[in-house]
Amino acid sequence: MNDVTYYLISLASQSPAGSFGLNTNNLVTTLINIGVVLCLLIIFGKGFLRNFLDTRKNKIVNTMQISDELYSSAVEKLEKAQARLCKVENEAKQLRVTGYSEIEHEKLNLINSTYKTLERLEKKKKETCSFEQQQAFNDVRQWVLQQTLQRVLKTLNGSFNPELHLRTIRINISMLGTLK
C-alpha cells in the first residue's frame, strides 16, 4: 500500500515541463485524489472499521448464543410437554376405561334396582288387587246377606201371626230344654 502512495505522490510532484505547474489532465488528477482519500481512509479509518466490525461480530455471536440457549430451552420444554401429554393421554385412557366399567356397573345396579322395584310394585299391586277383591266379596256378601235378611223379615212379618209366633217360641224353648 505504501508503494502505491509513493507512486501517486511522485506522479503528482512531476510536471511535464519539469517545474511546478498545473496539471490539466483531469482524469489523472481525479485518480490521484481518489487514491489519496482512500489511503487516508485506510490509514486513519482502520481502527474505527476494526472496532465497528468487532462490535458487530460480538453482537452476532451473542445473538447466536442467546438463540442457541432459547432453542435448547424450547426443546427441553417441548420434551417435557410431550412427556406430560403422554402421561395425560394415558390417564385419560385409564379414566375412560374406568368410567366405562363404572357406567356398566351403575347400569347393572340401576337395572337390578328397577327390577326389584318392579317386583315390589307388582307384589303390592297383587296385594292391593287381592285386598280390593276380598273387600268387594265382603261387600257383596254383606249386601246379599242384608237383602236376604230383609226378605226373610218381610216374609216372616207377612206370614207370622201371633199364634204361629207363640208356637215357634214354644218349639225353640223345648229344643233348648233338650239340649241341657
Swiss-Prot record:
The chain crosses the membrane at residues 28-48. One of its GO terms (molecular function) is proton-transporting ATP synthase activity, rotational mechanism. The keyword Ion transport applies. InterPro entries: ATP_synth_b/b'su_bac/chlpt (IPR002146). It is a single-pass membrane protein. It holds the Pfam family ATP-synt_B. Keywords: ATP synthesis, CF(0), Chloroplast, Hydrogen ion transport, Ion transport, Membrane, Plastid, Thylakoid, Transmembrane, Transmembrane helix, Transport. F(1)F(0) ATP synthase produces ATP from ADP in the presence of a proton or sodium gradient. F-type ATPases consist of two structural domains, F(1) containing the extramembraneous catalytic core and F(0) containing the membrane proton channel, linked together by a central stalk and a peripheral stalk. During catalysis, ATP synthesis in the catalytic domain of F(1) is coupled via a rotary mechanism of the central stalk subunits to proton translocation. In plastids the F-type ATPase is also known as CF(1)CF(0). PANTHER family: ATP SYNTHASE SUBUNIT B, CHLOROPLASTIC (PTHR34264:SF3). This is ATP synthase subunit b, chloroplastic. It comes from Cuscuta obtusiflora.
